[in-house]
C-alpha cells in the first residue's frame, strides 16, 4: 500500500517541505526508516537520529525545521507526536480489510445480554446475562463480559480482557475466609481502550467505574469499587486496589501501584514502579521508587536508610548543643 505525501498533508494539515508526489510505502522509527517510509521526531534530544535518518520524510516541530530541511523533506507541525498518531490512524483505515461477521460464530452471548448491531464480537468471547455492549465497540478474541456489566460506544477490548470477575473480598472467621459476594457490576464509558489480559473486577455493593476516554495497557488489575476518571491512562502491569479513586487526566507508569481506598486528584502523574501509599490531593508528578544501583552499593544505601531516624535524632542533639554553646557569653 502507498499514500502520496501530498495526500497525507491534504487530509491532516501541516506545512509540507518537499515533493508532494513522493510515494510513502510505510511508517517507521527514525533509525530504521527507509527512503520510502515516513517517520517523526517527537523530542529534540533525538535530533542526531534525525540527521542520520534515511526516511523519505520526517514529521517535526517548528523548532526542528532547519535540522530536518538539511537532510530532506519534512512536515512541520506544532505537535509531531499527535500528527504521527493521526497518520497511523489514516494508514490503518487505508489498509485492505477482510469482511468478517460482526459476531463470530464461536462467541457465546446470553439471550438476556444486549449487543448493539454495530458492535463487533470476536472469536470465543463470552457475554453474560444482563451485560451490554455499545455501538462500534470491538471485542477481540476471548474477551469475557460478566453479568450486568456495561461497555459504552467505540471501545476496544483486546484479547483476554475480563470485565466483571468477582472482586477480592473475604471476611476472616475462625482461621478461615468467608466470601463477600460481589453484588455490583462494571460500567465502562465511551472511547475506552483496554489492553490484553487486563482485569476489571465488579464492585462489592456499587459498580466499578471506568469513565470516557480511559486507556489501559496490557496486564492491568483494577480492583472492585475503583473509580477511574476521564482520559486517564495506565501503562502495563499497573494495579489499582479496591475502592481507590483515580481522577481525570492522570497517568500511571508501568508497574505502578495505588493502594486501596486512596484518592488521586485530577492531573496526577505517577512514575513507573511507584507505590502510592497515601492520597494525593494536588496535581503534579510523583515518584516513589528507590534508584537502581549495583547490589553492594544498594545494600549499603538501604542499611543507611534504615538508620535515618536515629541519625536525625543525633543531628538534632548536636544542633541543640551547638546552639547552647553559641548562646554562652
UniProtKB/Swiss-Prot annotation:
Does the entry annotate any disulfide bonds, and if so which pairs? Answer: none
Write out the catalytic residues in the record: 224 (proton acceptor)
Q: Under which pathway is this protein filed?
A: Bacterial outer membrane biogenesis; LPS lipid A biosynthesis
User: GO CC terms for this protein?
Assistant: membrane
Transmembrane stretches, start-end: none
Asked whether the keyword Lipid biosynthesis is assigned, the reply is yes
Q: Which domain of life is it from?
A: Bacteria
Q: Which UniProt keywords apply?
A: Acyltransferase, Lipid A biosynthesis, Lipid biosynthesis, Lipid metabolism, Repeat, Transferase
What InterPro entries does the entry give?
A: Hexapep, LpxD, Trimer_LpxA-like_sf, UDP_GlcNAc_AcTrfase_non-rep
Q: Is Acyltransferase found in the keyword set?
A: yes
* Gene3D superfamilies per UniProt: Hexapeptide repeat proteins, MurE/MurF, N-terminal domain
One of the entry's Gene Ontology molecular-function terms is: N-acyltransferase activity
Reaction catalyzed: a UDP-3-O-[(3R)-3-hydroxyacyl]-alpha-D-glucosamine + a (3R)-hydroxyacyl-[ACP] = a UDP-2-N,3-O-bis[(3R)-3-hydroxyacyl]-alpha-D-glucosamine + holo-[ACP] + H(+)
Give EC number(s), comma-separated.
2.3.1.191
An example of a Gene Ontology BP annotation on this entry? lipid A biosynthetic process
Q: How does it assemble?
A: Homotrimer.
Family recorded in the similarity comment: Belongs to the transferase hexapeptide repeat family. LpxD subfamily.
Purpose of the protein: Catalyzes the N-acylation of UDP-3-O-acylglucosamine using 3-hydroxyacyl-ACP as the acyl donor. Is involved in the biosynthesis of lipid A, a phosphorylated glycolipid that anchors the lipopolysaccharide to the outer membrane of the cell.
Protein name stated in the entry: UDP-3-O-acylglucosamine N-acyltransferase
